[in-house]
Amino acid sequence: MITKPNRNELRKRRHLRVRKKVFGTPERPRLNVFRSLKHIYAQIIDDTKGHTLVHASTLDPELRGIAKGANKQSAKLVGELIAKRALEKGIKDVVFDRGGYIYHGVVKELADAARQAGLNF
């Protein structure tokens, strides 16, 4: 019997393929995006140490009442917030990791908002 592969399993495989090439350094950390059905999460990670330097999501107290759901408006707010927090810590250049998702919709909106707020990638 043929079984249809799970969408999330396929995404995880794509993400592993991408992660072979995308690596965050202390000078240029990795901006990782994860989206669930209800929320959007973004982290800036130094892969040499394995530490998260900055994070933002729709669950943050700053966005809790404003951002509702995992839509484009929420993604834009999360992108602006992660860029603001990164610039406060002195991080300007990052490597974008789309997390195995297609660069479209919510992921693209988050990336564009982070770029407009001052991150370079």
From Swiss-Prot:
Gene3D superfamilies membership: 3.30.420.100
Tell me the function of this protein: This is one of the proteins that bind and probably mediate the attachment of the 5S RNA into the large ribosomal subunit, where it forms part of the central protuberance.
Coiled-coil stretches are none
**PANTHER family documented for this protein:** 39S RIBOSOMAL PROTEIN L18, MITOCHONDRIAL (PTHR12899), LARGE RIBOSOMAL SUBUNIT PROTEIN UL18M (PTHR12899:SF3)
Reply yes or no: does the keyword rRNA-binding apply. yes
Matches recorded under InterPro entries: Ribosomal_uL18_bac-type (IPR004389), Ribosomal_uL18_bac/euk (IPR005484)
| Protein source organism | Thermoanaerobacter pseudethanolicus (strain ATCC 33223 / 39E)
Write the protein's name: Large ribosomal subunit protein uL18
Q: Which UniProt keywords apply?
A: Ribonucleoprotein, Ribosomal protein, RNA-binding, rRNA-binding
What HAMAP family does this protein map onto? Answer: Ribosomal_uL18_B
A Gene Ontology cellular component where this protein is annotated is:
cytosolic large ribosomal subunit
- The domain of life for this entry's organism is Bacteria
For this protein, what is any one GO molecular function term? Answer: structural constituent of ribosome
The text of the family note is: Belongs to the universal ribosomal protein uL18 family.
Q: How does it assemble?
A: Part of the 50S ribosomal subunit; part of the 5S rRNA/L5/L18/L25 subcomplex. Contacts the 5S and 23S rRNAs.
Q: Name one GO biological process term.
A: translation
